Amino acid sequence: MATQVPPSTTPTPFANRPAPPTKDLEIPEDYKKTFRGRGTVSKFVDPCEAARKASLDCLERTQYNRSECTDFFTAYKECKGNWLAQRKEDRMKGRDTV
């Protein structure tokens, strides 16, 4: 079994830091297309997959120093919030959600 490596507490050198997240990460993909694109609809279908991947990539590049990736986490939270608000609005208006 692999040992768990503690997160880094030293700042990542500027050359190794990931570029700041763009506003595009805060906008979810069309969830209807995302759901229909899969063979089976599951709870793991995520229209905010790009923001999720960017967050994980940031963690890997900074040796899991969470304080350097807060912008990416915020972008992911915004994306999820926008997606859930969009689904809620569609349900309230009687639109198809899947």
From Swiss-Prot:
Gene Ontology cellular component list: mitochondrial intermembrane space; mitochondrion
Motif Cx9C motif 1: where in chain: 48-58
Subcellular location per the Swiss-Prot or TrEMBL entry: Mitochondrion intermembrane space
Primary residence: mitochondrion
Family: Belongs to the COX23 family.
Motif range (Cx9C motif 2): 69-79
Keywords recorded for this protein, A-Z: Disulfide bond, Mitochondrion, Transit peptide
Residue ranges, annotated region (Disordered): 1-27
Functional summary from the UniProt entry: Required for the assembly of cytochrome c oxidase.
GO biological process terms, semicolon-separated: mitochondrial respiratory chain complex assembly
UniProt-listed PROSITE patterns: CHCH
Highest taxon of source: Eukaryota
Transit peptide location: 1-18
Protein name listed in UniProt: Cytochrome c oxidase-assembly factor COX23, mitochondrial
Biased segments, Polar residues type: 1-13
UniProt keyword Mitochondrion present: yes
CHCH domain ranges (all copies): 45-87
